[in-house]
Curated annotation (Swiss-Prot):
The keyword Mitochondrion does not apply. NCBIfam families: murD. This is UDP-N-acetylmuramoylalanine--D-glutamate ligase. Its main location: cytoplasm. The gene is murD. Pfam families: Mur_ligase_C, Mur_ligase_M, MurD-like_N. It catalyses: UDP-N-acetyl-alpha-D-muramoyl-L-alanine + D-glutamate + ATP = UDP-N-acetyl-alpha-D-muramoyl-L-alanyl-D-glutamate + ADP + phosphate + H(+). GO terms for biological process: cell division; cell wall organization; peptidoglycan biosynthetic process; regulation of cell shape. It is found in: Cytoplasm. Pathway: Cell wall biogenesis; peptidoglycan biosynthesis. Cell wall formation. Catalyzes the addition of glutamate to the nucleotide precursor UDP-N-acetylmuramoyl-L-alanine (UMA). Belongs to the MurCDEF family. It comes from Neisseria meningitidis serogroup C (strain 053442).
Length: 445
């Protein structure tokens, strides 16, 4: 990819935007910076990092009118905005940091494992990275999981990696055309980000872009959208909780199997919940696709401790177990968390719903939830979508109130589950802050 005689505008000045500016400047590209809102102190801060950098703010169209050839977008900005659509129609190119990394790894020959899905992608990315490291590979873990990919590349000073393990969101895949992963997965598709996409099919089509190239596809046989992503002539590894597949769960014995071969008992997997069995199957399939030995992978799975805020037991009081799934920010994630827990539940739901339909939670909660506690700006919408179910629903002004009321109703053996199915920004700084408040409320009981 050449940028000779090209002017590039980087839009969005968070971590990803800054990493793109640094990469492009290092490669001698003429680059400027844009953000819809720029405070003087932020300009001063970034200006210290990049001498002479030109800043634009206000309307994006006005910035683009300054002769830019390429728009490098941070993932939080949709390329479907009218100003960006007009820029493309006039011959402008739009790309993101994953497209820039793709050019690097394609030229250098690094292996890439790429992971997306509505739910579980951070857990699978962390597990795959952990397994690769444990098996001795020089491994880079980056992307939506936290470290921008170009920041990770800069830290390595251009050194080739044995494997890149990338968590990719639909936002990052929108303008990624050249990535050709050695192995890739779409773990599942459920309603999320429907405030950005036309419908669920539109969202699924964006996820499907991860399968460009001729690498191994790892697909969920239990998900109709994922089944439809199978490409002709490609090697595919299927995983399933419902059917005999390449990787599957034998429910009678509680063992994961590969074909007819025993792999590991679910009781030996340190991660809570049945949905994590699918995460393990996907991770092992991805790692085998880059040549790692199965026996070593299964031994290392047993020592992986998982991630905070993802179906994580935080404590127990008088026999009532409290589980933090604050990262459950959409309906699919919450449904999976509920399905993976066997004891009676009191579930705390609510926050910013992102345009989701909450009716799929009706079946998930039926027969398992003894009570539902609603918080946040979209509590009323959730109540409407669950109306008519045989559920005891209680509106709460705060998360602390929800914890107190749930505990007051619970008995020994019950679970109080925070799995909101919503984003957190109406009441909290983020899902981690929401988790902190939940843990604090538990400790205060």
């Amino acid at each position: 990819m050449t940028f000779q005689n090209k002017k590039i505008l980087v839009a969005g000045l968070g971590g990803t935007g800054i990493s793109m500016i640094a990469y492009l400047r290092k490669n001698g590209v003429e680059v400027a910076a844009y953000d819809a809102e720029l405070k003087p102190e932020r300009v001063a801060q970034i200006g210290k990092m990049f001498d002479g950098l030109v800043f634009y703010t206000g309307r994006l169209k006005d910035a683009l009118d300054n002769g830019f050839d390429i728009l490098a977008l941070s993932p939080g900005i949709s390329e479907r905005q009218p100003d960006i659509e007009a820029f493309k129609q006039n011959g402008g190119r739009v790309l993101g940091d994953i497209e820039l990394l793709a050019d690097i790894v394609n030229r250098r020959g690094d292996k890439v494992i790429a992971i997306t899905g509505s739910n579980g992608k951070t857990t699978v990315t962390s597990l795959v990275g952990y397994l690769c490291i444990k098996c001795g590979l020089d491994t880079v873990i980056a992307g939506n999981i936290g470290t921008p990919v170009l920041e990770a590349e800069w830290q390595r000073e251009g050194k080739k990696a044995d494997v890149w393990v990338l968590e990719l969101s639909s936002f990052q895949l929108e303008n990624t055309e050249s990535l050709r992963p050695t192995a890739a997965t779409v773990l599942n598709i459920s309603e999320d980000h429907l405030d950005r996409y036309d419908d669920l099919l539109d969202y699924a089509h964006t996820k499907d872009k991860i399968f460009r190239g001729d690498g191994v596809q790892v697909l969920n046989a239990d998900d109709a959208f994922c089944r439809a992503m199978k490409r002709a002539g490609r090697e595919v590894k299927w995983f399933s909780l419902e059917y005999e597949a390449d990787f599957w769960l034998e429910r009678e014995t509680g063992r994961l199997k590969q074909g007819n071969e025993d792999l590991i008992a679910t009781q030996d997997i340190p991660l809570q919940g049945l949905h994590n069995a699918t995460n393990v199957m996907a991770a092992v399939a991805l790692c085998e696709a880059v040549g790692l030995p199965r026996e070593a992978l299964l031994e290392h799975v047993k020592t992986f401790q998982g991630l905070p805020h993802r179906v994580e037991k935080i404590g127990e009081k008088n026999g009532v177990v409290f589980i933090d799934d604050s990262k459950g920010t959409n309906v699919g994630a919450t449904a999976a968390a509920i399905a993976g827990l066997q004891n009676p539940l009191f579930v705390i739901l609510g926050g910013m719903g992102k345009g989701q339909d909450f009716t799929p939670l009706r079946d998930a909660l039926a027969g398992k939830a003894k009570g539902v506690f609603l918080i946040g700006v979209d509590a009323l919408q959730i109540r409407r979508d669950l109306d008519g179910c045989d559920l005891n629903m209680t509106d709460c002004a705060t998360l602390e109130e929800a914890v107190q009321k749930a505990y007051a109703q619970a008995e020994a053996g019950d679970i109080v589950l925070l799995s909101p199915a919503c984003a957190s920004f109406d009441m909290f700084k983020g899902y981690a802050h929401r988790s902190e408040v939940f843990i604090g409320a538990f400790k205060a009981l």
